[in-house]
UniProtKB/Swiss-Prot annotation:
SUPFAM superfamilies: Bacterial luciferase-like. The gene is luxB. Light-emitting reaction in luminous bacteria. The specific role of the beta subunit is unknown, but it is absolutely required for bioluminescence activity. Heterodimer of an alpha and a beta chain. The lineage of its organism: Bacteria, Pseudomonadati, Pseudomonadota, Gammaproteobacteria, Vibrionales. This is Alkanal monooxygenase beta chain. InterPro entries: Alkanal_monooxygenase, Bact_Lucif_Oxidored, Bacterial_luciferase_CS, Luciferase-like_dom, Luciferase-like_sf, Luciferase_bac/NFP. It holds the Pfam family Bac_luciferase. It comes from Vibrio harveyi. One of its GO terms (biological process) is bioluminescence.
């Protein structure tokens, strides 16, 4: 198993955008000296639940300030971007970092974002699929020549061509059954989301294997990723209380049609939150539910930076001890 960090970069009344970004950069610099494999950046628009609307831009900065870790977009929303521009930027990052960039992408999860960016909501998945085909063609061949309902233009060279043979490593967020089925047919790794339940993760993992098998796709070497929030404290209730404050605005906005206490309880129990024993057991169960090969963690809900570093150090020591 490989381990990394992901950054949600939530704002709230105690955290301004400049503070959030500074904390991300500080943490990235610190963990780059440790044994973590990947740093991934979350994309969000028009709310406090993430201040980064351009994860490839942030990835470029992180690649420039780090030497060891891979850097990834966690969920670059390709449905609301022009695919050629996405491919150009991703290949440029791949070239300039000599292969340290990974391309994590997603369909758009918010219909309001689709409308704002003037994208067709009635054919969203078809657009998502066509965007990825253009990007993937650019990654694998250096060229693209689409002729579909959304994009049609002569064959072009997407410059620079990728440094990595076949293009940057790719993974897609498991945002719906439709996306999971699509990914399985292509043998693309999934990202299981931290705010999905274990039951949802297990369902998606089972669906992926079922569809892959039905289409003769060998997924034995596919490395799915799981994202989890981490908040450890010798006082488990203190860890849960702190994480609850961190998540409250997100839950109220993103799950407005769901019972608040039920969803909050699910997040607190099915992420790595509590004492060391409670959090490691929760992580173990989540990994077993989805069969992920890689784990990405966010430590951002921990306000005390000394405590946050101490927990990161413990994880790093376990990586050295058990996974080197």
């Amino acid at each position: 198993m490989k381990f990394g960090l992901f950054f949600l970069n939530f704002m709230n009344s105690k955290r301004s955008s400049d503070q959030v970004i500074e904390e991300m950069l500080d943490t990235a610099h610190y963990v780059d000296q440790l044994k973590f494999d990947t740093l991934a950046v979350y994309e969000n628009h028009f709310s406090n639940n993430g201040v980064v609307g351009a994860p490839l831009t942030v990835a470029g900065f992180l690649l420039g300030m780090t030497k060891n870790a891979k850097v990834a977009s966690l969920n670059h929303v390709i449905t609301t971007h022009h695919p050629v521009r996405v491919a150009e930027e991703a290949c440029l990052l791949d070239q300039m970092s000599e292969g340290r960039f990974a391309f994590g992408f997603s369909d758009c999860e918010k219909s309001a974002d689709m409308r704002f960016f003037n994208r067709p909501t009635d054919s969203q998945f078809q657009l998502f699929s066509e965007c990825h085909k253009i990007i993937n063609d650019a990654f694998t061949t250096g060229y693209c020549h689409p002729n579909n309902d959304f994009y049609s233009f002569p064959k072009i060279s997407v410059n620079p061509h990728a440094f990595t043979e076949g293009g940057p490593a790719q993974f897609v967020n498991a945002t719906s059954k439709e996306v999971v089925e699509w990914a399985a047919k292509l043998g693309l790794p999934l990202v299981f989301r931290w705010d999905d339940s274990n039951a949802q993760r297990k369902e998606y993992a089972g669906l992926y294997h079922e569809v892959a098998q039905a289409h003769g796709v060998d997924v034995s070497q596919v490395r799915h990723k799981l994202t989890l929030l981490v908040n450890q404290n010798v006082d488990g209730e203190a860890a849960r209380a702190e994480a609850r404050v961190y998540l409250e605005e997100f839950v109220r906005e993103s799950y407005s049609n769901t019972d608040f206490e039920q969803k909050m309880g699910e997040l607190l129990s099915e992420n790595a939150i509590g004492t060391y024993e409670e959090s490691t057991q929760a992580a173990r169960v989540a990994i077993e539910c989805c069969g992920a090969a890689d784990l990405l963690m966010s430590f951002e809900s921990m306000e005390d930076k000394a405590q946050q570093r101490a927990v990161i150090d413990v994880v790093n020591a376990n990586i050295v001890k058990y996974h080197s």
